[in-house]
Every structure is written in C-alpha cells, then in structure tokens.
C-alpha cells in the first residue's frame, strides 16, 4: 500500500510458512506445519524462529489478500477489475491465471519502467487507474505493462 515492492516482498516472505521450511535445519527450528499460516513466529532465546498458533483461518485469509490484492494488484469490486501491481524489481515478467464466474482470465505482466498501460484482448487500451468490466463467460487475455 506504500508502493515499496521490495520491502513488501521481504515482509511477505517472513510470514509465508514455506519460506521457513526450505532446508532441514529450518524445519527443525520452525516445528509447525509448512502448509498452514502461523499467528506467531517467536523471536526470544531458544524459541527464536519457531512458529506458533497455527490453523487460524483469519491469518490465512490476510496472507491471501496480501498476495492477490497488494502484490499482484488484482482487485475486483462490483464486477470490475483494477490492476495495480506492486512486485519486486526482479520480477520482470510473470503470468497469472484466474477464474471469475465462468470466465478465465490470463494476465501477463511486464515491467518496462513506464506509466502503467493495460491491453485487454489485444484491442482495448486502458491507462492508469481505469477498471476493466469483467465478463462472466469465456476467455480473456490482459497484458499489463508498468
């Protein structure tokens, strides 16, 4: 929300459970499920790095919200989509596929270091903070240059 993508990703990685289980030593320290969001990561003495209070659905929904809305920048409101990505500089190109009702959206992002431009189905050009009216059926291709 502060438009600091590298800091946002750093914080996201700190709370993402999979980041705490990449090597055996980290798994032994973390001690909780790598597929469940923890409410706490302890920082004191012999408990430093250990997860706690897992299986809280509120925590997982906030992580999902951070991923979708604030990092990938996808926000659906009243059947309209806005796209405002806040991704690290090293993410030069990436793709997202999502379904809305019976439609499938294929979104291709590309960082070019200029004003944001969105192209929908190769003909409709949307600039800055305009939204896209979502279709309920079919396939839709969106290209995001930012």
Residue ranges and their predicted role:
Residues 1-146:
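Non-catalytic C-terminal accessory modules of carbohydrate-active enzymes
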């Amino acid at each position: 929300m502060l438009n600091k993508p590298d800091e946002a990703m750093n914080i996201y990685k700190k709370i993402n459970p999979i980041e705490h289980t990449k090597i055996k030593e980290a798994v032994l320290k973390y001690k909780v499920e790598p597929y469940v969001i923890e409410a706490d990561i302890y920082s004191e003495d012999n408990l430093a790095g250990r997860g706690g209070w897992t299986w809280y659905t509120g925590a997982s929904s906030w992580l999902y919200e951070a991923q979708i809305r604030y990092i990938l920048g996808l926000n659906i409101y009243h059947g309209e989509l806005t796209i405002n990505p806040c991704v690290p500089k090293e993410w030069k190109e990436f793709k997202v596929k999502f379904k809305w009702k019976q439609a499938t959206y294929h979104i291709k992002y590309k960082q070019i270091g200029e004003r944001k431009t969105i192209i929908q189905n190769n003909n409709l050009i949307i600039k800055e903070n305009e939204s896209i009216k979502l279709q309920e059926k079919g396939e839709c291709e969106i290209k995001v240059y930012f």
